[in-house]
Amino acid sequence: MSNLIIRPAIEDDAEELAELLNEIIRIGGTTAYQSVMDKGDIIRDFVRSKWLLSCFVAEMEGKVVGFQHLDAADPEYSGPFKLGAGWSVIASFVRVDHHGQGIGRRLFQETKTAAKQAGSFAIDATIRADNTLGIAFYQNLGFRTYVTIEDVPLSDGTRMDRVRKKYDLTVEE
């Protein structure tokens, strides 16, 4: 995959990122997001999010084939997914027709560096329990399950467990 370029996301990527994420949302079952997003949503929630540490895109032959977003844990959040200072939160998305090609792993190399540079000691990945591909992806990167939160409502009211995985940045590889 020598023609894969990993670079920081910019606002001009937002339309392609929305297209990529919306395809995943429409298929269903692999993201907690259930409502399609437009360019403005992508800029607000990923490219320029309030607690942004990094957002990287994977580009192949001029086309975005994946992106990975990392926020610092939101100190204002008080819900069931509350994390303390020093934690960061990851979200990863790869075009369905590009799964299994190492794109997420390449993105994570950059994301992990950004997390360390920001002073994070751990990265959280919160994954729907029915997303077996996502659970395996994070497990293969070195994330380990630290808690399962049961019966969390999705935006449509469906109840779903969430598996929380932690990547410990304090352990040398």
Which residues does each PLM region occupy?
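Conserved acetyl-CoA-binding loop-helix of GNAT-fold acetyltransferases
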Residues: 100-113, 136-140
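Conserved GNAT-fold acetyl-CoA-binding loop/helix
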Residues: 18, 22-45
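Conserved catalytic-core motifs of GNAT/GCN5-like acyltransferases
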Residues: 71-77, 124-127, 139, 144-161
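Acetyl-CoA-dependent GNAT
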Residues: 11, 35-97, 108-109, 168-171
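Conserved GNAT acetyl-CoA-binding A-motif
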Residues: 115-127
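Residue-level preference for beta-strand/loop junctions
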Residues: 50, 86, 119, 159-161
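A short beta-loop-alpha structural element at the N-terminal edge
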Residues: 5-17
